[in-house]
């Protein structure tokens, strides 16, 4: 499971160093193979260990290519999916088209989200966190049943 937010840097070739606390697990569980694609709802990237991505692919394959909405989701997620192999130094090369989509330049937030990571431009990430906190503090609506059961 991946958790926490870590600032990492992209080098001039578009590579980022995976924090050491994740490297051994990614090598053990995925042989250092990951898949990066766009997030279709937010200006960030999604980075999955290959076994986790294969589960997503299976789910996507069950969608109908005749349904325009389902086909659009398939096209966006699969069409942007790029395999990334962690090198001996623990670095991943993020494809230029993906970096451009998320506005990634130098400082990048690697955010653990259970079975995957999100990659955010640092400034965009902190803006998003502020917006989310503001929204929660001003929320007056009913919580979903699942959120009501969440006790922190």
UniProtKB/Swiss-Prot annotation:
Name of this chain's protein: Transcriptional regulator MraZ
Domain SpoVT-AbrB: 5-52, 81-124
Function: Negatively regulates its own expression and that of the subsequent genes in the proximal part of the division and cell wall (dcw) gene cluster. Acts by binding directly to DNA. May also regulate the expression of genes outside the dcw cluster.
Xref: PROSITE patterns: SPOVT_ABRB
Gene name as annotated: mraZ
Recorded GO CC terms: cytoplasm; nucleoid
Keywords for the protein's UniProt record, in alphabetical order: Cytoplasm, DNA-binding, Repeat, Repressor, Transcription, Transcription regulation
Record-linked PANTHER family: TRANSCRIPTIONAL REGULATOR MRAZ (PTHR34701:SF1)
Organism domain of life: Bacteria
Transmembrane segments: none
MF terms (GO), sorted A to Z: DNA-binding transcription factor activity; transcription cis-regulatory region binding
CDD domains: MraZ_C, MraZ_N
Summary of subunit composition and partner proteins: Forms oligomers.
Signal peptide region: none
Subcellular location: Cytoplasm, Nucleoid
Organism, scientific name: Klebsiella pneumoniae (strain 342)
Single Gene Ontology BP annotation: negative regulation of DNA-templated transcription initiation
Main location class: cytoplasm
Protein family (similarity comment): Belongs to the MraZ family.
